[in-house]
Amino acid sequence: MVAPEDPLVTYWLALPAYNEERSLPALLERCIPLARTLEAAGARFRVVVVDDGSKDGTIASAKAFEGRLGVEVVPHVVNQGLGAALRTCLTAALERAADGDVIATMDADNTHDPGLLPEMYGRMEAEKADIVIASRYAPGGDEVGLTALRKVLSRGASFLLTLMTPVPGARDYTCGFRLYRAAMLRRAADAWGQRLVEEAGFTCMAEVLLKLGRGGARVTEYPLILRYDLKEGASKMKMMRTISRYFALIRRIRAAQMPRVA
């Protein structure tokens, strides 16, 4: 897949970050050999970090990679939550991407392996998919370092969403590591506007997948081993609020008219 106006595919990695000065440098270091590999194969790799009003040195950590990795920083003046940061990530990436490009999102806490992106793109092309989920629940996927409670919440949310608001091809509805075709994502952004991401917290990842997948986007998965043991610092998830928001999201999605995006 190439953009007609450009012979090169660009991978745009959009990272929502909040107080990740301890984890972000390690993740960006892992991106450097990936960028070299992609460029040697005739592709390009760019990173956009959306800083969601961090109170630590997250911005400085990202800017330290401007020369080595071409990182751009898009700041929020105040903390607005993961949903707003994801919305800005998608908007910023689409402003920079050609229709033939691909846009990836992942957590900025170094629990996801950016080295999977070429394989995810290969799966996307082989299956003519619009979205590839890096999935803990695909054959070969796993979770390392998660508490039993977090595992129950993640698996329970995906089970409930599969039961109540299924998306063909999806097992892992909540993981933030995904690869999207830019052209499809642009159609979705045009159709939904700012309403593409309405959830403020962690449920925003499921929301986007439901709106795209139930709007006709073709979804597949690639196995992910989530390395939560590499995370520096405590989780920012508010457990009870997240659970209540999943039930509210299901009600809203089941009642909504889904515009076609693919």
Enumerate the language-model features and the residues they cover.
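Hydrophobic helical membrane-anchoring modules
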Residues: 1-11, 191-262
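Hydrophobic targeting segments
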Residues: 9-15, 24, 31, 44-50, ...
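Donor nucleotide-sugar binding loop of glycosyltransferases
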Residues: 20-23, 54, 113
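Short, acidic, metal-binding catalytic loop of nucleotide-sugar glycosyltransferases
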Residues: 29-43
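Short beta-strand/loop segment that forms part of the nucleotide-sugar
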Residues: 39-53, 74-75
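A conserved acidic beta->alpha catalytic loop
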Residues: 51-60, 78, 110
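Acceptor/aglycone-binding surface of glycosyltransferases and processive sugar-polymer synthases
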Residues: 76-95, 102, 114-198, 230-237, ...
